[in-house]
Amino acid sequence: MLSSVLLQAALLALVSGVTGHAVVAEPPPRKTGPSHEAACGAAVVDVLENDIAGPIENAMAKADEEYNCNAYLCRGYQFEDNTDNVLEVSVGEVLYFHVDLIAGHHPGYANVSIVDTSTNEAIGDPLRSWDDWPNHLSGPPRDDIDYNVTIPATLGSSCSEAGNCVIQWYWYASGNKQTYESCHDFYVV
């Protein structure tokens, strides 16, 4: 009987260990597809598909000769696989976001930024940031998993075409050095 309980506990710990941590659920973020697999390789894509909320580093540990993408830009997810989810936004528009926090036991910092997809660099200051995420609030309400962002007027024409920019949610768990991202394609009209 005791061995059965220990086995169940070990299996639960194993499943918990491979289950991811956090991913934006609303609005729907970029996801995998054929272009993603062609760019990043089957081994990396398999890891990311098996744990959509897991750290990018888990996938990078499986990178092989097929890997030819930047997994640290939207987990390597490609615009071409996500054209049905492009957001059309206006300057000053407020967008609601919800993060599914699956396991937040590795605190770090997080932010939401507009990122130029050609350089993987933020355009301007973060739209939101948290120095201690996800421990920032015990909530409810929690402004770190349910929050709004406002499309800034400072983007100029850099984000006027779909695919040029993403709204990126970024969490770096500094204790265990793991990176989590969700990206949303958009363009400003």
PLM regions: where:
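Structured recognition/catalytic domains enriched at protein termini
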Residues: 19-189
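Fungal secretory targeting signals
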Residues: 1-25
